[in-house]
Amino acid sequence: MMCRSLTLRFFLFIVLLQTCVRGGDVNDNLLSSCLNSHGVHNFTTLSTDTNSDYFKLLHASMQNPLFAKPTVSKPSFIVMPGSKEELSSTVHCCTRESWTIRLRSGGHSYEGLSYTADTPFVIVDMMNLNRISIDVLSETAWVESGATLGELYYAIAQSTDTLGFTAGWCPTVGSGGHISGGGFGMMSRKYGLAADNVVDAILIDSNGAILDREKMGDDVFWAIRGGGGGVWGAIYAWKIKLLPVPEKLTVFRVTKNVGIEDASSLLHKWQYVADELDEDFTVSVLGGVNGNDAWLMFLGLHLGRKDAAKTIIDEKFPELGLVDKEFQEMSWGESMAFLSGLDTISELNNRFLKFDERAFKTKVDFTKVSVPLNVFRHALEMLSEQPGGFIALNGFGGKMSEISTDFTPFPHRKGTKLMFEYIIAWNQDEESKIGEFSEWLAKFYDYLEPFVSKEPRVGYVNHIDLDIGGIDWRNKSSTTNAVEIARNWGERYFSSNYERLVKAKTLIDPNNVFNHPQSIPPMMKFEEIYMLKEL
């Protein structure tokens, strides 16, 4: 979900949780014994006390309260490895004792897939694996996958004024899941996705083996950089390429409160600006409707000075009507805090910030052609019917159009103009209306269908949507034809890259230890595995 303002401080606990084993369950005891014998002691088990450390830890990185309800499945164990070796041992023990594994980096899975499952499961929470090592000389960094984007940005800003990284602008998103799905952000038009700038990685496979880029092989290294999180193994760390930024750049964050007609015109003009600006300039927009008026928040980042930024906007988007004081010069690190709605760089380092504590559901689209003015108008009229609905729009173009569709699994490159996200959010006291909210979102999504990508209508795995379908891995009749069933969402997220992802999955995790309802399946039959040699 797009992070928004209204930050609430969260508790900062987490050092070492005492092991507390629930008796009477042989499976639980076997896993506890295995973890302890391998030196993994930092775990807690399911508790009936809602004030226990177990529930504090479960909810600490649960970013969608929709999945906090008592009726939603809970993990039997939450394990917090503190080293590469402990992560390896945790995966080994869970696999040996046949537990379903859920890997949680920041907890931003839109469908709660990092902390829910239909079978007895273990959350492997990566938050203690959040160390970051910056090498300014080589312009690279090693980032443990439990580090949030905010922690990464803070570490870079403390080390250099002339290097940055391209990733999302919500600081509490975990780097493990974000990069695994691609990772779009405010500098993607200049440098591509986060995953495009990964040069090495450490992966723990289902047997607990520790693999670097060379050991995992080209297909698997390609797959983990955009093929989705929680599928290939446990990412211990990424080695990323740091990217040049000026000592001072320019940003703006401006909200326009206007009538629906004027808002429609602004959005209609924005779409032509967003993907055609120089790659050094990105303008994104959030929007919704309150009463009779729409609100549009325009977020801009220019890798240059204020005068140049204002000249470009005055020429390309004069309708926005920005004045001199609305352009602000600051360092790259300060800009990451500013665009997140934070006051200081140091706040980037707080992984427990809560930007919006409402439950939510989202959908995403990509466009390849311009959207007519009347479509924006009607979309805003639909938003006026639902106070909890809003949109987030991003332009592509620039570097995104220059990178080949198969460079990483993320295929939405040349020809893709815009990414639209539709969100509906609601408060706890509105849970009785969930059906109404879901129906509205489906109606909104259906309305946009003629104006977005087609055959198939594509999506983005970091905005995972179970409405598209899913596999119940408990049902053997589903798994026998899993590759074809999964094609329904696999080709929406990855287009023609789906086949290579299946190949990579079969190579690294043939027993499908790492799975969720929309994970990439391995080939199940011997003749299918033999076909890998032909791919």
Swiss-Prot record:
Residues 71-245 form the FAD-binding PCMH-type domain. Belongs to the oxygen-dependent FAD-linked oxidoreductase family. Residues 1-23 form the signal peptide. It catalyses: (S)-reticuline + O2 = (S)-scoulerine + H2O2 + H(+). Keywords: Alkaloid metabolism, Cytoplasmic vesicle, FAD, Flavoprotein, Glycoprotein, Oxidoreductase, Signal. One of its GO terms (biological process) is alkaloid metabolic process. The FAD cofactor is bound via a bicovalent 6-S-cysteinyl, 8alpha-N1-histidyl FAD linkage. Induction: Up-regulated upon fungal elicitor treatment and by methyl jasmonate. This is Reticuline oxidase. There is a cross-link at residues 108-170 (6-(S-cysteinyl)-8alpha-(pros-histidyl)-FAD (His-Cys)). Its EC number is 1.21.3.3. Its main location: cytoplasm.
